[in-house]
């Protein structure tokens, strides 16, 4: 039975998975959880708004989210579509309505539903109306029907919240201390709860004592004193709370001795309080210590006095882990193990952002209530509420990426270069580690990332290994309430920690018996003991498979010579992956199930509910024995991979034969696939993207992997199938350049269009001033000259289908003066500035679209889209799907190109030197497979591990009359002579990348200079010069060309004339009244002489003067001002 599950049948399971989940499900699930649960929880956390006024408070009720809408400048409201938000630079957001109940002197008033702000909507989420639309309706409102959603629209631009990778919070992670320090072993806990994170550190010093430190208390607190402050008083209770093992208990003697002078709770609290409330009364110190322990010590366990016992047992468990590490019973925790990582998705990040925004809202409302009541007005909540507090806080964070907690780059502009780059951006995972440090271990591929993170897709350079992408079938847990799972575990027979300690200390039971029991750890917290850990883990799995407990729960049983622990996890952010469950060597998913999947009778989720497929996190996978293939199954196996190639991410999945390439080549291709030009969105004609590229004739690859269809690449491809010859022809394809057939290019191969958007709005300024979009008149400041405005219509905007070039004005606009001074001195017309929008320097094109609309504030908004035809030319960059990139070195007409006996002429000629050292065998195999596909008309499957055998394809092309190694006899097109060697000819999919000569071509003679240094500006966008650097300078010094050196570094850079006093050597200044240069020291009593220097040198002298250093210039050959 096991061997019956063929690749095709398992592929049906994969198709079913993506049919029900999609590719950006992780963001949508997380955001949906936020709007359904977390939003109300944040309101309930607050509960009510207290005020300083006796008897007055406001109770908070349910929160409701409206439909996405825009509030127009005339105060009218109407629903909007995402496309309208994009075009009009609006935010796609919905109003939040909160029920408030004012309570005065315990008398509740009528509940009021109050508008408290706008919440940006994630496209295609549960609260987005378009998630329910049919394909036809989506097309009608201007959306790409295949767009996956998962991003926001803020001020008209698409922004994605990038998944953040973090160490798991609320877990005890032990490690050894730094060599040479006083600390031998440490434990770190990041206690994270609603709204804040508190790091707690436990240290074992060389003298055997344990100390705890956390932010609210300066210095380190001895562990035993903290235990007593938390309510566990006697030495015996403390020792048993830490461990039942006498060997571990013995390690606590130094700590108990150290704290022997402090015996009761108040003394312990006073010890802590004396560090925070210095010089205050004992009662105040104790009270302060209690507040700090409740609020800032392990807040995830609770913040009330009742939770102190829980905190004490948690601390004791952490100490026991440190002692076990010291005794050599356990290894230091691996921070890079994916069981110790959590991903923070849009929902979690939004929750933390909304919490801060809501707190600010509550603070403001409290102030407004008190102010209103003091003035004796009637309570009118709707008038007092300021909704812009919530709206602006959230919008600003999304628009800039600056999140609460000091994180930057959390939200990014969605990369729309092509379809793949967009999907990849939505599945990206960023580590919070600083990229400046080496962190080699963190960047390495870890075994637990198998099936969770793509092994190939990571950037080169400083972010390598820190920026990752989800593997195809990685799924992220949303999490369920811990209390439900805890209750279930106790019902299953787990004995609570306190009960076990009571039995041993008071009941007289044998502690050695309990030592054999397993510790049960729920989300990093020791909750009790169970006799047989293996049995408990299996019971939990059985109940999960039966659907009695949530499939979000994962369990791992860790057993070594000394450790026996059952870890149960149900928190959010764990990366999990689905596997087929195996029983007695047989997979539980049968052929009947697969037939039902195909017919649509059941879905992938049904298989999970039936207990045939389950999601494992990295911790539970430690217990799993997973077979890669059904044929490998033995009775010992617990799970079967659904499909091995699913370990790859989205971009690596499109590479044919990736297992035949050297690993870095696949990494390079993963980066380049995101730069290829194709069809980035089906609604490109309606969109106003800042910059966009469109390939005119994208083709589906002839050699495909199975994942292409799922990703949607076959509908939105980015490349062409090119006939490739591998030979050195003319030498114009040396060093990775390629020769391209000019005739193919003339027939339209790799033609693309580049779109650039220019936009401006009529801004209204305070004081009644405003911009005007008109044809500027000759009198305004900064007027460019009549020929620059020649293309504008009467309304000041260019017409569609007009040719433009760099410097031409597209939108005429005048603005009021920047400074009040100008306004007073000049007439209103003269004071106006020309702020017209001009075509970028060095760019050209045809006006494609003109959009005139208005923003939500009622300002006129004009957008002009310019298109430019890009025909492949020398220097444009291309790449195959195997990391083989190259630029066009020469375009040769078809008549001069080599041709085969059958008259086939290549589109691209690649130099053979590009292949041996790079070992991209995948490309050679793709050429053979592509040749077979072109001859037979059948698409070739090149899925990694499950490909059509290459030998089979070689036999096939032999039947069509071609050599199996794909080489052919070739004639030189220029001479007609036969070329001695046989030449490899195949069909390979090549991509045009967005690095084109037209965007980079740059030169300048004269041009703008910087204000400060008066040296030429830098960069193409600023019409900058080409830097003549230090090394170039050294060459000219070595060569001895003094005049050339002066020409480059002085005459054509920042030559300036200064006047120097011959007595004191200071730089003089020009006195307007006397009409001559004077010395700052001697006035007009000394002679000043002109000196030609570099302006940067003059600047240096003056900056030194500002630092009270007095450089003086000594003059040699003096030439007076009159030349005498």
Curated annotation (Swiss-Prot):
Top EC group:
transferase
- Gene Ontology cellular component annotations, sorted alphabetically: cytoplasm; DNA-directed RNA polymerase complex
Cofactor info, note text: Binds 1 Zn(2+) per subunit.
EC number(s) of the enzyme?
2.7.7.6
**Which family does the UniProt entry place this protein in?**
Belongs to the RNA polymerase beta chain family.
Described by its record, this protein's role is as follows: DNA-dependent RNA polymerase (RNAP) catalyzes the transcription of DNA into RNA using the four ribonucleoside triphosphates as substrates. This subunit is involved in DNA promoter recognition.
Subcellular compartments = Cytoplasm
GO MF, one term, reads:
ribonucleoside binding
- Which cofactors are reported in the record for this sequence? Zn(2+)
Q: How does it assemble?
A: Part of the 13-subunit RNA polymerase complex.
Q: What's in the keyword line of the UniProt record? A: Cytoplasm, DNA-binding, DNA-directed RNA polymerase, Metal-binding, Nucleotidyltransferase, Transcription, Transferase, Zinc
Biological process annotations from GO: DNA-templated transcription
Pfam families, A to Z: RNA_pol_Rpb2_1, RNA_pol_Rpb2_2, RNA_pol_Rpb2_3, RNA_pol_Rpb2_4, RNA_pol_Rpb2_5, RNA_pol_Rpb2_6, RNA_pol_Rpb2_7
- The record lists Zn(2+) as bound by 1061, 1064, 1079, 1082
Query: Is Zinc one of the keywords UniProt gives this record?
Result: yes
Give the catalytic activity: RNA(n) + a ribonucleoside 5'-triphosphate = RNA(n+1) + diphosphate
Organism listed in the record: Saccharolobus solfataricus (strain ATCC 35092 / DSM 1617 / JCM 11322 / P2) (Sulfolobus solfataricus)
Protein name according to UniProt: DNA-directed RNA polymerase subunit Rpo2
Q: Which domain of life is it from?
A: Archaea
